[in-house]
């Protein structure tokens, strides 16, 4: 049970992190050289 829970948490964090990086990279690509944080 613990191993399944830990694996689920790890996969969740990895998916969220990868999604966040993809979104930020996409927004930077759309904006170009503009840095509007």
Curated annotation (Swiss-Prot):
Give the way it sits in the membrane: Single-pass membrane protein
Q: Which keywords describe this protein according to UniProt?
A: Chloroplast, Electron transport, Membrane, Photosynthesis, Plastid, Thylakoid, Transmembrane, Transmembrane helix, Transport
Single biological process term from Gene Ontology = photosynthesis
Report which superkingdom the organism of origin falls in. Eukaryota
User: Which InterPro entries does the annotation name?
Assistant: Cyt_6/f_cplx_su5, Cyt_6/f_cplx_su5_sf
Can you tell me where the transmembrane regions are?
5-25
Which compartments does it reside in?
Plastid, Chloroplast thylakoid membrane
Q: Which GO terms describe its cellular component?
A: chloroplast thylakoid membrane; cytochrome b6f complex
Q: Where is this chain primarily localised?
A: plastid
Tell me one GO molecular function of this protein.
Answer: electron transporter, transferring electrons within cytochrome b6/f complex of photosystem II activity
A Pfam family that this protein carries is PetG
The subunit field of the Swiss-Prot or TrEMBL record says: The 4 large subunits of the cytochrome b6-f complex are cytochrome b6, subunit IV (17 kDa polypeptide, PetD), cytochrome f and the Rieske protein, while the 4 small subunits are PetG, PetL, PetM and PetN. The complex functions as a dimer.
| Family according to the record | Belongs to the PetG family.
Provide the function of this protein.
Component of the cytochrome b6-f complex, which mediates electron transfer between photosystem II (PSII) and photosystem I (PSI), cyclic electron flow around PSI, and state transitions. PetG is required for either the stability or assembly of the cytochrome b6-f complex.
* Record's protein name: Cytochrome b6-f complex subunit 5
């Amino acid at each position: 049970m613990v191993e399944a829970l830990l694996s689920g948490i790890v996969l969740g964090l990895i998916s969220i992190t990868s999604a966040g990086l993809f979104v930020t990279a996409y927004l930077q690509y759309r904006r170009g050289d503009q840095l509007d944080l």
